[in-house]
Amino acid sequence: MREFHIANKTYVKSHNSTNKIIARYTYSLIIFALLTIIINLLLGNKTQVLSLIKSILLSLIITSVFTYLIYIIKKEYNIKKIYTEDTTIALSLIIGLFSVNIDIIILTLAIIVTLFIKNIKKDINLSSVLYGILLIIIYKYFTNNLDTPLTILKNNSFNMNYNEILDINNGIYNYLFGINYLSPILSIIMFIYLFHKKGIKYNIVISYILTISIIMFLYGIFTDKMWFILFELSTGSLLFLTIYTLTDYKVSPTIGETQILYGIILGIITSILRFIIPELSVIITIIFGELLLSKYLDNISYKLKYNKKLYNSLIIISMILIIITIVILTIIY
């Protein structure tokens, strides 16, 4: 008699399916970069556009060189594969968008760290870039080059009004379309594209963003800062990183029930960290989720799928945690 076992794993139908997922993300990132350039040209930000193009080209060249060296070490000599079956272009675009005006040595180190993580942790793909971005942000912090709206608001103990917030970034257009913080509008458009192409685990993205939105909206009401939710969603590259790194297909939950819980839990963590270490909040949250939480949820995924009582209980606990989080943030900040 054949014995059956329950396997908590992510299954991809074929190697071709994996390539399709990578291709969809790559296409969307190319469109994102092109639209960012076009929008900033229309806004008259020519200097920023040149800096962005330079950053992307440098990132692509450096990533290609080191990826090819890795291929040589592995005794693979198919250069075409680097761009057609690997995440080289996608990783280059993400790092390039994050490293505008960054020192080339730091850019190179960030790429090396990204590729190192990607190759030692075989299941990680696009989210490996988080480790490189982490290095870039830490460098900016220690060189006093991290004067972003998030850090300025924190340094002012979150006591700023709507007009002061707009002045930080020279108007609302730079929040919505600005090159420095990765346009939330374009991020939403790319999410719609990936959702349409069935290339993203939308349950995770929606539950994550919805959790953060609820917490920030209620915090804004209780502290007389109705603008707070829009500020949080449009800064710190929150939407961009959520769409491109939160749902890495091999290291994020696969079943709908666990995906929703995953998004809610990480949303609570991010909301708290936005008040403590704002620029690193999303990065640290996603890394934590991939290293610890995702594996645990996958281990209990079968129980959650077929034991609705347990699943509903966990959802209720999550809602209680959201309320507690709002109360604590309102009292402290």
Residue ranges and their predicted role:
Residues N125-L130, I229-L238, T258-L261, I276-G289, ...:
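Loop-to-transmembrane alpha-helix initiation sites
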